[in-house]
């Protein structure tokens, strides 16, 4: 079993890379891919860069060059659930674009033309993530809708509009739906795991800078615990 792991920024992958053994790396299109062993599994970890285009490029290269059995997207997100605090975790129950609008042609808000409205993670990966939750100590985790767009959300007016469109949204970020869409088209199972770095409000820029390292650590810890739950025949 080989697992691809994608984070957008250095703090989101640094703990994973530091824990890897037997590593080798190559750089393609200015994106470094580090192969090795983590939690007893063969993995390839990459820092994609920020945003949907960067994430799509990295995911496509990862799948084409390394043929992973599954892809995990790890990192930080802005939170929309009152019961969660900075550092807590959202496991994707589904992933959607929040900045896509082709409703004039009969699609749902957030649905890209000729694509599903929501991208659904592999149940076995979500199950493994839920088993890992019990080992997280004081860190809380829930399953929920994660939405993606090419904007850092820190405007209450925009937040209100997003919640009108996606009332069950638990978190928003800038890569997950792009990664999910690429995985969908290649037929590769995926899951998105995000730790909250801010609460998508006026304080978000300050919160993000202060808490990105904490969020990156918690998300990386969740990924490593998830990997420990996977058996060689887990892929479905």
Swiss-Prot record:
Family: Belongs to the PNP/UDP phosphorylase family. MtnN subfamily.
Disulfide partners: none
Reported function: Catalyzes the irreversible cleavage of the glycosidic bond in both 5'-methylthioadenosine (MTA) and S-adenosylhomocysteine (SAH/AdoHcy) to adenine and the corresponding thioribose, 5'-methylthioribose and S-ribosylhomocysteine, respectively. Also cleaves 5'-deoxyadenosine, a toxic by-product of radical S-adenosylmethionine (SAM) enzymes, into 5-deoxyribose and adenine.
HAMAP family, alphabetized: Salvage_MtnN (MF_01684)
SUPFAM superfamilies: Purine and uridine phosphorylases
UniProt keyword terms in alphabetical order: Amino-acid biosynthesis, Hydrolase, Methionine biosynthesis
Residues annotated as catalytic: 12, 198
CDD domains cross-referenced by the UniProt entry: MTAN
Extent of the signal sequence: none
One Pfam assignment: PNP_UDP_1
E.C. number(s) listed in UniProt: 3.2.2.9
Catalytic activity of the protein: S-adenosyl-L-homocysteine + H2O = S-(5-deoxy-D-ribos-5-yl)-L-homocysteine + adenine; S-methyl-5'-thioadenosine + H2O = 5-(methylsulfanyl)-D-ribose + adenine; 5'-deoxyadenosine + H2O = 5-deoxy-D-ribose + adenine
UniProt GO cellular component terms: cytosol
Cross-referenced InterPro entries: MTA_SAH_Nsdase, Nucleoside_phosphorylase_d, Nucleoside_phosphorylase_sf
Gene: mtnN
An annotated GO BP: nucleoside catabolic process
Pathway field: Amino-acid biosynthesis; L-methionine biosynthesis via salvage pathway; S-methyl-5-thio-alpha-D-ribose 1-phosphate from S-methyl-5'-thioadenosine (hydrolase route): step 1/2
Protein name listed in UniProt: 5'-methylthioadenosine/S-adenosylhomocysteine nucleosidase
Positions of substrate binding: 78, 153, 174-175
Gene3D superfamilies xref list: Nucleoside phosphorylase domain
EC top class named in words: hydrolase
Entry GO MF terms: adenosylhomocysteine nucleosidase activity; methylthioadenosine nucleosidase activity
